[in-house]
Amino acid sequence: MSAQDFLVELGTEELPPKALASLGDAFLAGIEKGLQAAGLNYTGKQVYAAPRRLAVLIRQLDVQQPDRSINIDGPPLQAAFNAEGEPTQAALGFAKKCGVELAEIDQSGPKLRFSQHIPGKATVGLLPTIVEDSLNDLPIPKRMRWAASREEFVRPTQWLVMLLGDQVVDCTILSQKAGRESRGHRFHHPENVLITTPANYVEDLRKAYVLADFAERRELISKRTAELAMQQEGTAIVPPALLDEVTALVEWPVPLVCSFEERFLEVPQEALITTMQDNQKYFCLLDSEGKLLPRFITVANVESRDPKQIVQGNEKVVRPRLTDAEFFFKQDKKQPLETFNERLKNVVFQAQLGTVYDKAERVSRLAAFIAPLIGGDAQRAGRAGLLSKCDLATEMVGEFPEMQGVAGYYYALNDGEPEDVALALNEQYMPRGAGAELPQTLTGAAVAIADKLDTLVGIFGIGMLPTGSKDPYALRRAALGVLRILIEKQLDLDLTGAVEFAVKQFGAKIKAPGLAEQVLEFIFDRLRARYEDEGIDVATYLSVRALQPGSALDFDQRVQAVQAFRKLPEAEALAAVNKRVSNLLSKAEGAIAEQVEPKYFDNANEFSLYSAIQQADQAVQPMAAARQYSESLARLAALRDPVDAFFEAVMVNAEDAKVRANRYALLSRLRGLFLGVADISLLG
């Protein structure tokens, strides 16, 4: 079957830059879906996305659908005809369903059968519907209409190219009649561009100063920006999302170096970077020490004969932005940071939980409680907690919300606060996302944990639990943040005590029985997904969860130990034994004695197991005290042989009540050794 390249390009007014790449991918996916549904084969595919166009190239597409045959079985012959040979309603209904007369139905087999040969259609006739369906299915939250047209799309359409081989596909889509004329760069090549064949699409547009390939433009911008930064003895800050957005804004990218006055460097560099990235889409430059240079890179969409004009224009545009940041910084510094706390009395945190001022007071007390438990200073943590929300009332954060915490850090330093107190004002929000940076100071860790626990307890206390995808207070992220800080920073905090302390801080604002237990369960449930992401089996998590350790660090150490234990050759058998022992002990009548009485042994294997348990107990006690859980389980693995021998030779449920009770006590000692680490009976 012959094949030809297929190209479709929809020209529009400027598309939303943040959505451009995803729109292109969805356009390609929709066309592929349509081609596959039509049974059309092809050898390759490529999507192109630029500010004013979405295009898809399909290589070596079948020009004709393959013929196909359909066979539909109907009712059995005995149900299709009565004794007189007349057709029944079942037969007539089947023929009607197939859209033919009963005489056209095959009656030679055990059942009625309708067979039909369907010749394949020409691909050129199928493509308009496939393209139109793909465009209709694009993920566009809000479509628009334009002029007198009743068509709807993300932006007004301007032209349409559709070629199968070197022939135009005759159709009209979104009010645009298909042709072979595209458009070049607005300024460098305002004339139409004749697309000779689909294979020549990219090069035809390149000659018209349009780089249609999103990936090519992105790579060019990234590479050229790095080169220019190196020439300035700096490194460019190139966040992937910003790079994608800039790529979506230009058809013919030309990166240029611009500068601003050095006096602006007295302003916190985070504020300058924020305004240059978010508002102007510039790439900022850092020196070798990570400090902001008074230069930045803009990406022009034209190759100017006088690039200085573009540079000067961008420098002129950014100056008022930087001047605003400078003004806010100077204004805020005119008064101590602590004085902004008063303004927070009028800022509601949550209607039932009080103001942001109230929250800061609670965080201060909770941070002071937590700090000494993780090796920090209670006084400094309390001070940091008290100042933690002050910058929310500053002009800087009012203009640049991303500066919360960062602004507080600079203002605290300006007021002469200790370095760790100042750092904690920014670190309280860490981690800001999955895999993001953690607090580096103990003061910051204490405030970060306190802030998150206060939110968890408060929101749970008023019954606003997260459901499904709805989590307006980001409680899942808060819980994961607490766990990451404690585990990755190796901080041994008893969360039970911390959560109970947090509950008390709310006083009469919340009355929820079992609130502390509910919050703790929610926090530790977050570990399940964390371990699954790390490839740790859920049974390992559950074996530790059964013991309900209050320390996240201790929990993690136990999980890692169980994971290592499961790789030992004895693990499976010992897990099965523990499960058997657990079942036996659960059926025991009355309390199980704590002491084992050797005088009731009547089998050598009882003595052997008892001796092995005694030796193991002495060996693992110091290990358990030092939380050497892996070493402890490795030592307990040596119990496999005496345990196997015991169960092979000894009937646990002996007729003599004292012998039976003593054997239960022996098995309880055995199980207790393993429960010092985890309930490995759950591993089976």
Swiss-Prot record:
Belongs to the class-II aminoacyl-tRNA synthetase family. The keyword Transmembrane does not apply. Keywords: Aminoacyl-tRNA synthetase, ATP-binding, Cytoplasm, Ligase, Nucleotide-binding, Protein biosynthesis. It catalyses: tRNA(Gly) + glycine + ATP = glycyl-tRNA(Gly) + AMP + diphosphate. NCBIfam families: glyS. It comes from Pseudomonas putida (strain ATCC 47054 / DSM 6125 / CFBP 8728 / NCIMB 11950 / KT2440). One of its GO terms (biological process) is glycyl-tRNA aminoacylation. It is found in: Cytoplasm. It holds the Pfam family tRNA_synt_2f. GO terms for cellular component: cytosol. The gene is glyS. This is Glycine--tRNA ligase beta subunit. InterPro entries: DALR_anticod-bd, Gly-tRNA-synth_bsu, Gly-tRNA-synth_heterodimer. It comes from the Bacteria. Its EC number is 6.1.1.14. Tetramer of two alpha and two beta subunits. One of its GO terms (molecular function) is arginine-tRNA ligase activity.
